[in-house]
Regions:
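Residues that define the transmembrane beta-barrel architecture of outer-membrane proteins
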Residues: 28-30, 58-62, 105-109, 120, ...
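Outer-membrane beta-barrel channels and translocator barrels
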Residues: 27, 73-75, 119-122, 178-180, ...
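Bacterial Sec-dependent N-terminal signal peptides
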Residues: 1-35, 212-218
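Residues on the lipid-exposed face of transmembrane beta-strands in outer-membrane beta-barrel proteins
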Residues: 34-38, 64-72, 82-84, 111-117, ...
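Predominantly the C-terminal beta-signal and adjacent terminal strand-loop region
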Residues: 157, 166-169, 174-219
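Flexible, solvent-exposed loop segments that connect beta-strands
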Residues: 43-56, 86-107, 134-165, 198-200, ...
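Short glycine/proline- and aromatic-enriched beta-strand/turn motifs that initiate or cap beta-hairpins
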Residues: 28-70
Length: 219
């Protein structure tokens, strides 16, 4: 009976090892991608968003950095990323905040941590992100009554200052294809800011980005 029990234990451990090796062999590849994105962003103004909606205009920017895919199973990966991105928003002329047309641009470092689910060459991913604003500028267009003004935004406790740290969530999908020795993924993603980034009124980042992700194709 003891001998039989020992044999059963050995068989269980052997089965576990085989399963782990199989998962490792057939899981998604672990890789590092170079990321280049086109980003369209705007602000949601919280309780004032309905009043300002007709004045809002998107700001185009760029995003570049790196994306690490850690394959865990054939259908699931963990994806931490690090990149530099430009966000912001525009209010058209006659808006109730700046009167003249104004544009805010924020220059940030961003770290998303995503869960990615694979379906052949397609995938979907979502997860939280943390961002830090290095600097930014607000430009107010000129008029006969108000001169043009471009100033660097501040990050103190003053009424018109901004907050450096931001948290939010991202969700999107992508498609992977191969070209010669490169693996290329096209990724479309929406970003939803969860924290207010300014002191004087509600401002939450919103953004849509289309990115190209390139890594060396596995043989």
């Amino acid at each position: 009976m003891i001998l039989s029990l020992r044999m059963n234990i050995k068989m269980i451990f052997t089965s576990i090892i085989i399963c782990l090796l199989s998962i490792n062999t057939f899981s998604q590849k672990t890789r590092l991608d170079v990321v280049l994105s086109s980003v369209n962003t705007n602000f949601n103004y919280g309780n004032s968003n309905g009043v300002l909606k007709s004045y809002k205009k998107k700001v185009s920017g760029v995003q570049f950095g790196a994306s690490f895919q850690g394959g865990l199973t054939p259908w699931f990966s963990i994806v931490p990323e690090l990149y530099f991105t430009v966000k912001g928003g525009t209010l058209k002329a006659n808006n109730p905040i700046t009167i003249n047309e104004s544009t805010i641009r924020l220059y940030e470092g961003e770290i998303p941590l995503l869960a990615r689910f694979h379906f052949g060459k397609f995938y979907i991913n979502s997860g939280p992100y943390l961002a830090y604003t290095f600097t930014g500028r607000i430009k107010i267009e000129g008029s006969p009554a108000i001169p043009e003004k471009s100033t660097k935004i501040s990050f103190d406790d003053s009424r018109d200052a901004f907050k450096r740290w931001e948290m939010g969530a991202q969700a999107g999908a992508g498609y992977v294809f191969h070209h010669k020795e490169s693996r290329i993924a096209v990724d479309l993603r929406y970003s939803y800011g969860l924290t207010n980034i300014s002191q004087d009124l509600d401002r939450y980042n919103r953004g849509l980005n289309l990115s190209v992700r390139i890594s060396k194709s596995e043989k």
